[in-house]
Amino acid sequence: MSKLYFTEDHEWVSVDDDGIGTIGITDYAQKQLGDVVFVELPEIGREIERGGDAAVVESVKAASEVYSPVSGEVVEANDSLPEAPGQVNTDALGDGWFFKVRLSEPAELDELMDQEAYDAFVGELD
């Protein structure tokens, strides 16, 4: 499995050997949201900036922006999410991914947290 990187806004990115990052929200985030009922995904070909609005997730509790942890071009969106948004709750780090990006600035990964740092960050929130 590729290494996971995390943001303080509870997004994750996993980058493959071809420089494609798969992006989603963390298990912590989905638990805070509650049952996800709607997901709006970015368009293929869209250029997104690190920290910029990329997608929307709505739950029974709230609507929330999903920010991109990296800059690049959207190359794929998880087409199954609009029909089955609950995948975000059941498999946030797997089938519940939101979109994939061809990284334009791979060095941005160095500014993100690894699993250990993210776990410590979340531990301070509870």
From Swiss-Prot:
It comes from the Bacteria. PROSITE patterns: BIOTINYL_LIPOYL, LIPOYL. GO terms for cellular component: cytosol; glycine cleavage complex. Residues 20-102 form the Lipoyl-binding domain. Keywords: Lipoyl. It comes from Rhodospirillum rubrum (strain ATCC 11170 / ATH 1.1.1 / DSM 467 / LMG 4362 / NCIMB 8255 / S1). Pfam families: GCV_H. The keyword ATP-binding does not apply. The modification N6-lipoyllysine is found at K61. Belongs to the GcvH family. The glycine cleavage system is composed of four proteins: P, T, L and H. GO terms for biological process: glycine decarboxylation via glycine cleavage system. InterPro entries: 2-oxoA_DH_lipoyl-BS (IPR003016), Biotin_lipoyl (IPR000089), GCV_H (IPR002930), GCV_H/Fam206 (IPR033753), GCV_H_sub (IPR017453), Single_hybrid_motif (IPR011053). Transmembrane segments: none annotated. Its cofactor is (R)-lipoate. The glycine cleavage system catalyzes the degradation of glycine. The H protein shuttles the methylamine group of glycine from the P protein to the T protein. NCBIfam families: gcvH, PRK01202.1. Binds 1 lipoyl cofactor covalently. This is Glycine cleavage system H protein. SUPFAM superfamilies: Single hybrid motif (SSF51230).
